């Protein structure tokens, strides 16, 4: 009976360790994906702002011609 208890404990322990490792890897993968998504959002915001520069220059030049 003691052998069976030790065997079950060993199986439980190894399963728990394996599960912990898998969860850690999943967490790291999710963090990397979130960082990549944040980088994409920042680049798209920069592109929008850079796209507004010609419009702003046109508006300023039009206002300077009026004044």
From Swiss-Prot:
GO cellular component: extracellular region; membrane; other organism cell membrane
Major location (coarse): secreted
Positions annotated as propeptide: 23-48
One of the Pfam families matching this protein, by short name: FSAP_sig_propep
Region feature Disordered, mapped onto this chain: 25-46
Tissue specificity annotation: Expressed by the skin glands.
Official protein name in the record: Medusin-PT
Organism: Phyllomedusa tarsius
């Amino acid at each position: 009976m003691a052998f069976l208890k030790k065997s079950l404990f060993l199986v439980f322990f190894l399963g728990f360790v394996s599960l912990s490792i898998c969860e850690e890897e999943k967490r790291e993968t999710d963090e990397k994906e979130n960082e990549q998504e944040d980088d994409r959002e920042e680049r798209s915001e920069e592109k929008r702002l850079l796209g507004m520069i010609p419009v702003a220059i046109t508006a300023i030049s039009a206002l300077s011609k009026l004044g």
